[in-house]
Amino acid sequence: MDIPASDHLAHAFPVSVKGVAIQDGKVLLLENERNEWELPGGKLEVGEDPLDCVVREISEESRWKVDAGPLLDCWQYHIRPGSDVVIVTYGCYVRSMEPPVVSNEHKRAGLFAAGQVPDLVMPDGYKRSIATWFARLRGEQQTAR
Protein backbone atom coordinates (compact mmCIF):
# COMPACT_ATOMS: atom_id res chain seq x y z
CA MET A 1 0.00 0.00 0.00
CA ASP A 2 1.38 3.40 -0.97
CA ILE A 3 1.10 6.02 1.73
CA PRO A 4 0.74 9.58 0.45
CA ALA A 5 3.69 11.77 1.48
CA SER A 6 1.35 13.95 3.54
CA ASP A 7 0.25 10.90 5.56
CA HIS A 8 3.71 9.38 6.03
CA LEU A 9 4.24 10.74 9.56
CA ALA A 10 0.79 9.60 10.63
CA HIS A 11 2.04 6.04 10.20
CA ALA A 12 5.61 6.51 11.46
CA PHE A 13 5.09 6.56 15.23
CA PRO A 14 4.43 3.44 17.29
CA VAL A 15 1.87 3.73 20.10
CA SER A 16 2.92 2.72 23.60
CA VAL A 17 0.19 2.22 26.20
CA LYS A 18 1.35 2.76 29.79
CA GLY A 19 -0.33 2.28 33.16
CA VAL A 20 -0.08 4.25 36.39
CA ALA A 21 -0.38 1.46 38.98
CA ILE A 22 -0.39 2.60 42.61
CA GLN A 23 -0.22 0.14 45.51
CA ASP A 24 -0.20 1.28 49.16
CA GLY A 25 0.46 4.88 48.14
CA LYS A 26 3.40 4.07 45.86
CA VAL A 27 3.58 4.03 42.07
CA LEU A 28 5.25 1.18 40.18
CA LEU A 29 8.08 2.32 37.90
CA LEU A 30 10.59 0.36 35.85
CA GLU A 31 14.14 1.40 34.97
CA ASN A 32 14.97 1.11 31.26
CA GLU A 33 18.24 0.77 29.32
CA ARG A 34 18.55 4.59 29.11
CA ASN A 35 18.66 4.73 32.94
CA GLU A 36 15.26 6.43 32.99
CA TRP A 37 12.31 5.40 35.10
CA GLU A 38 9.16 4.68 33.12
CA LEU A 39 5.65 3.45 33.62
CA PRO A 40 4.97 -0.21 32.85
CA GLY A 41 3.38 -0.80 29.48
CA GLY A 42 4.28 -1.33 25.88
CA LYS A 43 3.49 -1.40 22.22
CA LEU A 44 -0.12 -1.50 21.13
CA GLU A 45 -0.53 -4.46 18.77
CA VAL A 46 -2.57 -4.18 15.57
CA GLY A 47 -6.24 -4.72 16.42
CA GLU A 48 -5.61 -4.71 20.18
CA ASP A 49 -7.78 -2.63 22.51
CA PRO A 50 -5.60 -0.15 24.47
CA LEU A 51 -7.19 -1.21 27.78
CA ASP A 52 -6.35 -4.86 27.09
CA CYS A 53 -2.82 -3.81 26.09
CA VAL A 54 -2.09 -2.01 29.37
CA VAL A 55 -3.39 -4.94 31.45
CA ARG A 56 -1.33 -7.44 29.41
CA GLU A 57 1.85 -5.35 29.48
CA ILE A 58 1.76 -4.67 33.22
CA SER A 59 1.31 -8.39 33.85
CA GLU A 60 4.20 -9.27 31.51
CA GLU A 61 6.57 -6.65 32.94
CA SER A 62 5.80 -6.93 36.67
CA ARG A 63 3.45 -9.91 37.18
CA TRP A 64 0.95 -7.50 38.72
CA LYS A 65 -2.72 -7.97 37.97
CA VAL A 66 -4.56 -4.71 37.32
CA ASP A 67 -7.87 -3.41 36.07
CA ALA A 68 -7.51 -0.59 33.57
CA GLY A 69 -9.17 2.65 34.60
CA PRO A 70 -9.57 6.04 32.95
CA LEU A 71 -7.47 7.59 30.23
CA LEU A 72 -5.04 10.06 31.85
CA ASP A 73 -2.97 11.58 29.05
CA CYS A 74 -1.58 11.24 25.53
CA TRP A 75 1.52 12.85 24.03
CA GLN A 76 4.38 12.36 21.58
CA TYR A 77 7.71 11.47 23.20
CA HIS A 78 10.96 12.20 21.36
CA ILE A 79 13.36 9.50 22.56
CA ARG A 80 16.32 10.43 20.31
CA PRO A 81 16.75 11.68 16.72
CA GLY A 82 14.62 9.53 14.44
CA SER A 83 12.86 7.77 17.31
CA ASP A 84 9.49 9.05 18.47
CA VAL A 85 6.56 7.28 20.08
CA VAL A 86 3.01 8.24 20.97
CA ILE A 87 2.43 7.58 24.68
CA VAL A 88 -1.06 6.89 26.03
CA THR A 89 -1.46 6.56 29.82
CA TYR A 90 -4.26 5.01 31.88
CA GLY A 91 -4.88 4.93 35.59
CA CYS A 92 -4.92 1.33 36.83
CA TYR A 93 -6.44 -0.34 39.87
CA VAL A 94 -3.96 -2.86 41.32
CA ARG A 95 -5.35 -6.28 42.30
CA SER A 96 -1.98 -7.80 43.27
CA MET A 97 -0.64 -7.57 46.79
CA GLU A 98 2.78 -9.12 46.16
CA PRO A 99 5.92 -7.16 45.23
CA PRO A 100 6.49 -6.66 41.50
CA VAL A 101 8.73 -9.14 39.68
CA VAL A 102 10.72 -7.35 36.98
CA SER A 103 10.96 -8.94 33.53
CA ASN A 104 14.09 -9.05 31.36
CA GLU A 105 12.87 -5.89 29.57
CA HIS A 106 13.99 -3.65 32.44
CA LYS A 107 16.89 -3.29 34.87
CA ARG A 108 14.78 -3.10 38.01
CA ALA A 109 11.42 -2.17 39.47
CA GLY A 110 10.77 0.48 42.08
CA LEU A 111 7.84 1.71 44.15
CA PHE A 112 7.81 5.46 44.74
CA ALA A 113 5.68 7.82 46.83
CA ALA A 114 4.17 10.85 45.08
CA GLY A 115 6.72 13.17 46.65
CA GLN A 116 9.65 11.20 45.22
CA VAL A 117 8.49 11.29 41.59
CA PRO A 118 9.44 14.90 40.68
CA ASP A 119 13.14 14.17 41.35
CA LEU A 120 13.31 10.99 39.24
CA VAL A 121 14.91 10.86 35.79
CA MET A 122 11.88 10.28 33.59
CA PRO A 123 9.85 12.08 30.91
CA ASP A 124 7.67 14.92 32.18
CA GLY A 125 4.61 13.31 30.60
CA TYR A 126 4.94 10.33 32.94
CA LYS A 127 5.29 12.64 35.93
CA ARG A 128 2.14 14.48 34.83
CA SER A 129 0.18 11.22 34.51
CA ILE A 130 1.38 9.98 37.90
CA ALA A 131 0.39 13.24 39.61
CA THR A 132 -3.02 13.13 37.92
CA TRP A 133 -3.73 9.56 39.05
CA PHE A 134 -2.56 10.18 42.64
CA ALA A 135 -4.91 13.21 42.77
CA ARG A 136 -7.87 11.26 41.35
CA LEU A 137 -7.36 8.38 43.78
CA ARG A 138 -7.23 10.83 46.70
CA GLY A 139 -10.50 12.32 45.44
CA GLU A 140 -12.09 8.86 45.23
CA GLN A 141 -11.03 8.10 48.81
CA GLN A 142 -12.48 11.39 50.09
CA THR A 143 -15.74 10.78 48.24
CA ALA A 144 -16.01 7.28 49.74
CA ARG A 145 -15.85 8.65 53.31
Enumerate the language-model features and the residues they cover:
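A short coil-to-beta-strand element that immediately follows conserved catalytic motifs
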Residues: 64-74
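A structural signal for short, well-ordered beta-strand segments
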Residues: 19, 71, 90-92
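Acidic, metal-coordinating catalytic segment for phosphate/diphosphate chemistry
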Residues: 1-18
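Conserved Nudix-box catalytic region and its N-terminal flanking loop in Nudix hydrolases
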Residues: 22-60
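Nudix hydrolase/Nudix homology domain
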Residues: 37, 104-145
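Active-site-adjacent beta-strand/loop module that shapes the phosphate/pyrophosphate-binding cleft
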Residues: 76-99, 137
